[in-house]
């Protein structure tokens, strides 16, 4: 088993929900010359997983072109500008918030898997070992900031205002027994904070790129109840494109 396969399987082992994957339906509609499907994705695991199904899609008349992108903004901008046919890196709450703020006509085409958000540290092995008053880095985009705070609440580390919901921010923290200082950072930069912060809340894909194995190295991690399934996103009206249906 090569390193790439091991890396992918490590993430999938941590995913409580495997909702789709390399098992694709057969289509009568295929072309003699393959039709290109251009998909933007973050490299790990999304890009790796797409590369694994290229042969399956080619057999259905689709040439899958994977464009690897390393941030959470560019994939949606390129999709809206018709430079991509689809993207694969985000969950529905993030897409809904991003599309609303930027006034983009984008929609989910289908759910794929949950990439769990987890707490990681290079200094501590258990969350109980993190000293009171320590700095914890969390994502600064609205949906993933709320997601990180709900992770802490679900583990009994903080308490949020009852009406905070999926838009919770650090201002909604009403109880913080260990007086953690939450520092908001752009998601791709979170692994870099580990030299300074006591711990950082990092998405599974960025954690893997930083050398962590989510199933093994987390201090705390989302469970199977997480509503944040990663999706394939498309422009509105394209969800039934036969190439997209084959992908999802």
Segments the model singles out, each with a brief description of its role:
Residues 26-38, 57-59, 127-133:
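Immediate post-signal peptide segment of exported/extracytoplasmic ligand-binding proteins
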Residues 33-44, 62-68, 135-136:
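Short, well-ordered beta-strand elements
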Residues 66-77, 164-192:
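Short helix-initiation/N-cap motifs at beta->coil->alpha
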Residues 97-109, 124, 196, 201, ...:
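Ligand-binding "clamshell"
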Residues 109-159:
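A conserved helix-loop-strand patch within extracytoplasmic ligand-binding domains
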């Amino acid at each position: 088993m090569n390193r790439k396969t091991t890396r992918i399987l490590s993430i999938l082992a941590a995913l409580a929900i495997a909702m789709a994957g390399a098992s694709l339906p057969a289509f009568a509609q295929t072309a003699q010359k393959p039709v290109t499907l251009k998909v933007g994705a973050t490299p790990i695991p999304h890009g790796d997983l797409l590369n694994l199904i290229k042969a399956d899609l080619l057999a259905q008349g689709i040439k899958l072109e994977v464009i690897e992108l390393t941030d959470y903004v560019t994939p949606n901008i390129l999709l809206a500008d018709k430079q991509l046919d689809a993207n694969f890196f985000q969950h529905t709450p993030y897409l809904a918030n991003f599309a609303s703020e930027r006034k983009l006509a984008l929609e989910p085409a289908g759910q794929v898997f949950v990439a769990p958000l987890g707490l990681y540290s290079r200094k501590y092995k258990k969350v109980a070992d993190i000293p009171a008053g320590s700095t914890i880095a969390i994502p600064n985009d609205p949906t993933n900031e709320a997601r990180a705070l709900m992770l802490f609440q679900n583990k009994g580390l903080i308490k949020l205002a009852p009406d905070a919901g999926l838009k919770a921010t650090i201002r909604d923290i009403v109880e913080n027994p260990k007086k953690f200082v939450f520092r908001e950072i752009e998601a791709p930069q979170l692994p870099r904070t580990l030299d300074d912060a006591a711990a950082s809340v990092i998405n599974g894909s960025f954690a893997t790129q930083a050398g962590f194995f989510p199933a093994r190295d987390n201090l705390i991690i989302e469970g199977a109840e997480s509503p944040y399934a990663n999706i394939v996103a498309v422009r509105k009206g394209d969800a039934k494109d036969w190439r997209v249906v084959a992908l999802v």
